[in-house]
């Protein structure tokens, strides 16, 4: 299983993009939640509220998901990165694979 993490400016955008990725069957599901972020941007420290999302997919869909997320993302320089999960309940992995077919 592959987890793709990204942040968004607000709940609406996180849910909108999550829905589009579901409709394209690039992900089986996603989780979105409010976060507080601190980061450097254009020479200044910024602290802000954002929304994060974790998108769940298969290794076969990872590249296509990454490219589509980059295309849809509203940020100039979005945080988008993947994590490979080694141990997944077999039944869950079967459901995930079936969901992105």
From Swiss-Prot:
**According to its UniProt record, where is this protein located?**
Cytoplasm
User: One of this protein's Pfam families, by short name?
Assistant: CutA1
Q: Which UniProt keywords apply?
A: Cytoplasm
Q: List the record's Gene Ontology CC terms alphabetically.
A: cytoplasm
Gene3D superfamilies the record matches: 3.30.70.120
Q: Name one GO molecular function term.
A: copper ion binding
The record's listing under InterPro entries reads: CutA_tolerance, Ion_tolerance_CutA, N-reg_PII-like_a/b, N-reg_PII/ATP_PRibTrfase_C
Q: Which domain of life is it from?
A: Bacteria
For the biological process aspect of GO, one term held by this record is: response to metal ion
Function of the molecule: Involved in resistance toward heavy metals.
State the oligomer form and interacting partners. Homotrimer.
The UniProt entry, under PANTHER family, shows: DIVALENT CATION TOLERANCE CUTA-RELATED, FI09726P
Q: Which family does it belong to?
A: Belongs to the CutA family.
Protein name, per record: Divalent-cation tolerance protein CutA
């Amino acid at each position: 299983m592959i987890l793709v993490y990204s942040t968004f400016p607000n709940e609406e955008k996180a849910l909108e993009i999550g829905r589009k990725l579901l409709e394209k069957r690039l992900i089986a599901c996603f989780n979105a939640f409010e976060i507080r972020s601190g980061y450097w941007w254009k020479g200044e420290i910024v602290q802000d509220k954002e929304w994060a999302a974790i998108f769940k997919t298969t290794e076969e869909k990872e590249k296509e998901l990454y490219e589509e997320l980059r295309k849809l993302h509203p940020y100039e320089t979005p945080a988008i990165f993947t994590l490979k999960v080694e141990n997944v309940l077999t039944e869950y992995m079967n459901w995930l694979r079936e969901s992105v077919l």
